Amino acid sequence: MLKDEVLKLKKEKDVVILAHNYQVPEVQDVADFVGDSLGLSRQAAKVKQKTILFCGVHFMAETAAIVSPDKRVLIPDLEAGCSLSDSITVDQLRKWKKEHPDAISVGYVNTTAEIKSELDYCCTSSNAVNVVNAIPREKEILFLPDMFLGSYVAKITGRKNMQIWAGECHVHAGITPDHVEKKLAELKNAEFVIHPECSCTTPMMHDVASGRYKNHQVQILSTEGMMNHVSKSDSQQFVVATETGILYRMRQQNPQKTFIPASESAECEYMKMITLDKVYRSLYDEKYEVKVAKKIADKARLAIERMLSIS
């Protein structure tokens, strides 16, 4: 079996496999660690193995290379990109910063290494609120690139001086209020867990505050926040508004509970480019290595380390 070959090879070559929550089940099954962007960044920094095989999209492998400069980072497919990280270029960011010279720039980890090297702080969906709260309130903030996460953070923190870039994740932007309304009508006892990148987040927050959902519990959480919440909650049925790959891990860890995607079509084609066959080829051929130029990596590391110190 291919799975057995992968497990054998990674042991022989002393390679650690990190996989994002959105990876296909066969890839999650061979990983040493499965998690969100923040959790995997931390694992990359502390694992003892000198080679990391990163099963996720390209910016995640770059982040692993930045936080682990003494390790070799491989990715099974160099073409596994990200519509959100592509929504801002370094030239656009530099121009934006020039227009707001006294502002603090806070960038989602879903950005390229070059973008990170221009930031004051990185953040993830699980710590964005903490990062913004750590910045003096009188300071203007440039938040990029996800407009739905940015709007959520501005609302939670009460910041009136946040400029928000108009980028989006095409998968999360596709999870609309209509998807949620339909599930609310169909599933009277379900609890809703919603990723802050979703386009339904802001209207949902308004409706929760107004008491519109009555007995429905609605939580807005990062993917790892979702994992922790569903395991602790007494609810038996959950509607999950994020990329559908996370449902596999949820069902594995909570077999007695039911998990329903808010949108069955919420699949990231870039995440799904990483297959078990490509993982095997990457291990066997020891490719494709992800390298970040030292000058860019050193600057980007500062923004990431500031984030990790707050988290």
What are these regions (language model features)?
Residues M1-A241, I246-S311:
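Active-site loop-to-helix "anion-binding N-cap" substructures in soluble metabolic enzymes
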